[in-house]
């Protein structure tokens, strides 16, 4: 594959979801990325460029192809075959939005190959239909911090563009599949608990919109929707929470379904907190991340544009 054959690239950030009580609604982009580099070809194929995605299906059984094809089919279009190089540092099944990033990238892929000219709202709704909720997908699509509601016929989203914080993630070296994490959740919620849980979630949203990050951190651990049930799957959660609190962090939450644990701290203090947490959790990967203001980015090859005129 040479430069002249490259059509375009798609770069999509990973994400965290929930921030505690913002269950299936609140998402935040993180500075881990998935990148697709797309080349002209006579057949569909996928090539892994990083260890993170080693072993992904190389043909049309790849998730990215399947989502892209469903998107094209919805608009009555047929995609031309391409070769796709896949680069990613978003670990799979760790609660950092790897599947949502792949879905957003796939929709962007179909949009570019078929000239669909999808709006941001179109892309959000299509991605949310695939995911079942808009938190991770919305954050990967537009960047920043998002609050969303997905219904079959419509997806609503509010974007908070400047999350002026640092984030440290503690990533255990085991997977928690989303379906397993959902299996531990209760099938029903007592009315009184639902009322209290809703109030907690309301305060989280108000604190986010006010950019009162210390309050956001305090409220994250008051979640009643999922963390009390999923904590058994991630034994590091309470320990990270304790150490982070001792080091002055704003707060701690499961990232999505876990097992990654997200710690929110003051802007400029992420690297220092990363070093401190790494000392306490040597059996985990610990990384300092930022909240990118941009979501998915398309970069087109000018050589291809000239050739296509």
Swiss-Prot record:
Task: Report the EC code(s) recorded for this entry.
Answer: 2.7.1.39
The positions annotated for binding ATP are 91-101
| Record SUPFAM superfamilies | GHMP Kinase, C-terminal domain, Ribosomal protein S5 domain 2-like
Compartments annotated for it: namely: Cytoplasm
GO BP term (any one): threonine biosynthetic process
Q: In which pathway does it act?
A: Amino-acid biosynthesis; L-threonine biosynthesis; L-threonine from L-aspartate: step 4/5
Tell me, what is one Gene Ontology molecular-function annotation carried by this entry?
Answer: homoserine kinase activity
Please list the reactions this protein catalyses.
L-homoserine + ATP = O-phospho-L-homoserine + ADP + H(+)
Give the main location: cytoplasm
Q: What keywords would UniProt list here?
A: Amino-acid biosynthesis, ATP-binding, Cytoplasm, Kinase, Nucleotide-binding, Threonine biosynthesis, Transferase
GO-annotated cellular components: cytoplasm
| Protein role | Catalyzes the ATP-dependent phosphorylation of L-homoserine to L-homoserine phosphate.
Family, similarity comment: Belongs to the GHMP kinase family. Homoserine kinase subfamily.
The UniProt entry, under HAMAP family, shows: Homoser_kinase
- Can you say what this protein is called? Homoserine kinase
Source organism: Bacillus subtilis (strain 168)
Classification from the root reads: Bacteria, Bacillati, Bacillota, Bacilli, Bacillales
């Amino acid at each position: 594959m040479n430069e002249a054959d490259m059509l375009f690239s798609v770069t999509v950030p990973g994400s965290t979801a929930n921030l505690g009580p913002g269950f299936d609604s609140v998402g935040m982009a993180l500075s881990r990325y998935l990148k697709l580099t797309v080349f002209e070809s006579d057949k569909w194929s996928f090539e892994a460029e990083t260890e993170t995605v080693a072993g992904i299906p190389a043909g049309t059984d790849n998730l990215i192809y399947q989502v892209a094809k469903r998107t094209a089919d919805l608009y009555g279009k047929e995609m031309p075959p391409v070769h796709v190089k896949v680069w990613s540092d978003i670990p799979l099944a760790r609660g950092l939005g790897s599947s949502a990033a792949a879905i957003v990238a796939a929709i962007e892929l179909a949009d570019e190959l078929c000239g669909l000219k999808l709006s941001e709202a179109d892309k959000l709704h299509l991605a949310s239909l695939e995911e079942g909720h808009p938190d991770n997908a919305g954050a990967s699509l537009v960047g920043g911090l998002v609050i969303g509601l997905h219904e079959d016929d419509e997806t609503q989203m509010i974007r908070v563009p400047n999350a002026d914080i640092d984030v440290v993630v503690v990533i255990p070296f085991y997977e928690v599949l989303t379906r397993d994490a959902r299996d531990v959740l209760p099938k029903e919620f007592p009315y009184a608990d639902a009322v209290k849980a809703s109030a907690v979630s309301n305060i989280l949203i108000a604190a986010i919109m006010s950019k009162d990050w210390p309050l956001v951190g305090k409220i994250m651990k008051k979640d009643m929707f999922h963390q009390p049930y999923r904590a058994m799957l991630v034994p590091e959660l309470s320990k990270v929470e304790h150490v982070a609190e001792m080091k002055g962090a704003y707060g701690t939450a499961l990232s999505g379904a876990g097992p990654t644990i997200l710690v929110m701290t003051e802007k400029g203090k992420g690297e220092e907190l990363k070093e401190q947490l790494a000392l306490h959790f040597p059996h985990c990967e610990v990384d300092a991340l930022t909240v990118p203001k941009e979501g998915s980015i398309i970069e087109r090859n000018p050589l291809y544009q000239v050739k296509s005129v």
